[in-house]
Amino acid sequence: MTRSLKKNPFVAKHLLRKIEKLNTKAEKEIIRTWSRASTIIPTMIGHTIAIHNGREHLPVYIIDLMVGHKLGEFSPTINFRGHAKNDNRSRR
């Protein structure tokens, strides 16, 4: 179920403060965050945000096509290594 249009998109307050601070300075820094549930808003465009995937922070450059999506969508948490091979020699 999608979020109601009457409500504003969720963005963590600490993340929003950091982005507004960088926008006033006009500097580009990598912002580290654990807030995967935050929605990408237009003020984030052009910034690089390092999103935590449970083990490390993955840097993601925010572009205009990402607006409206959640930060966690761009930081995969599971690394699928494939199914086990069917090795007939090990069965003998």
Swiss-Prot record:
Localization, UniProt: Plastid, Chloroplast
Paired cysteines (S-S): none
Keyword presence, Glycosyltransferase: no
Alphabetized GO MF terms: rRNA binding; structural constituent of ribosome
Job of this protein: Protein S19 forms a complex with S13 that binds strongly to the 16S ribosomal RNA.
Identification of the protein by name: Small ribosomal subunit protein uS19c
UniProt similarity note: Belongs to the universal ribosomal protein uS19 family.
GO biological process: ribosomal small subunit assembly; translation
Taxonomic path: Eukaryota, Viridiplantae, Streptophyta, Embryophyta, Tracheophyta
Keywords assigned: Chloroplast, Plastid, Ribonucleoprotein, Ribosomal protein, RNA-binding, rRNA-binding
Entry GO terms, CC: chloroplast; mitochondrial small ribosomal subunit
InterPro entries: Ribosomal_uS19, Ribosomal_uS19_bac-type, Ribosomal_uS19_CS, Ribosomal_uS19_SF
Protein species of origin: Lobularia maritima
